[in-house]
Amino acid sequence: MNYVPELKKYYKDSVIKELVKEFEYKSIMQVPKLEKIVISVGVGEAVRNKKLLDSAVLELAQITGQKAVKTKAKKAIAGFKIRQGQEIGAKVTLRGNAMYEFLYKLIHLALPRVKDFRGINGDAFDGNGNYSFGITEQIIFSEIDYDKIERISGLNITIVTTASNDKESKALLLKFGMPFSN
């Protein structure tokens, strides 16, 4: 039998039924679900130090279990000494089982390790049911060895759902156990 992540099982067994009751959907196909999770890191100093970008790519791969892709500058910014097409960051897009595994790890293992953690901002939805937030230190993930990192950097995490509005999306993430502060 194929492996199914715990969070995916929980979604199919409990969350769908609860959301159908709460929002009175006529079909379970209307119930919002996770589409993908995008984890990105911007390395502005990569302009001067290429080692930092390689380090960020490696750390993203360790955190997610999937190879990271380097991202390039869309346009030149003279103030930051960035040219168009220059590699300045990295990202990973998770789908399927890897997405559910990462979300479980984020909610239950990584976020509780943040100092003075009181929940994440519950207002950072984009109006289309997607949620984005930042983490200031990558060392909250247990896969990162504190002694081997080049420098402490932050991560941007975007959770893309099929929800049509923010209310449905927030309800979905709350059912998964996302620790919102408001």
Curated annotation (Swiss-Prot):
GO biological process: translation
Database matches in PROSITE patterns: RIBOSOMAL_L5
Record bears the keyword Transport: no
GO cellular component, one term: ribonucleoprotein complex
Family, similarity comment: Belongs to the universal ribosomal protein uL5 family.
Cited PANTHER family: 60S RIBOSOMAL PROTEIN L11-RELATED
Name of protein: Large ribosomal subunit protein uL5
Source organism (scientific name): Borreliella burgdorferi (strain ATCC 35210 / DSM 4680 / CIP 102532 / B31)
